[in-house]
Amino acid sequence: MSGEERRYEILQLLKTQTTPLSGAALAGQFHVSRQVIVQDIALMRAESYDILSTNRGYLIRQKGETDSFPKRVFFVRHTTEQVLEEFMAVLDFGGKILDVVVEHELYGQIRVDLMIESKQDAQDFYSKLLHSRDNPLKILTDDCHYHTIAAPSEKLLDLIAQELRRKGFLLE
């Protein structure tokens, strides 16, 4: 199979998925290395396909409910042990954590899609965080970071802000 054919097949798979596909799973399915998949994804993005890279794998961005939701960027600070508490504060008010962003002194803005949409997503992310040899991005900026949060209404975004403030996470 040529690279072009493989990328076409990967794209078809991503279009039918509602959950992320890991690079390792794609590599196994197409009998190539994970690095080849990373390169394929980069080439597809260069062709204007909106492919998200999450901690659970790759997704193609579909037009969905979150697209029409109001969004707000929150500047927060907390310990690694408080990550799950932060996520739950957002999810309890119907919010979704779309990304994490840090402002690095040397590299500038570093943004990673999270797509934490449920308590199960939050638990899974936190479990991976605790068992990973890697550190969260917030370590680069003394625990300070941003999240883009989407919620069904501005009122819910206000309640999320209030809860993050109450917990001492929101920096203003």
Residue ranges and their predicted role:
Residues 28, 58, 104-105:
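Conserved beta-strand edge residues that scaffold enzyme active sites
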Residues 1-28:
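Extreme N-terminal segment that seeds HTH/winged-HTH DNA-binding domains in transcriptional regulators
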Residues 20-53:
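N-terminal helix-turn-helix
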Residues 8, 12, 39-42, 127, ...:
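Solvent-exposed alpha-helical segments within well-ordered globular domains of core cellular machineries
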Residues 51-62:
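Minor-groove-contacting beta-hairpin "wing" of winged helix-turn-helix DNA-binding domains
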Residues 15-19, 35, 46-49, 92, ...:
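Generic secondary-structure signature for well-ordered alpha-helical cores
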Residues 68-172:
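Mid-protein regulatory/catalytic core that forms ligand/cofactor-binding pockets
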Residues 1, 14, 31, 77-78, ...:
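Residue-level marker of alpha-helix boundaries and capping positions
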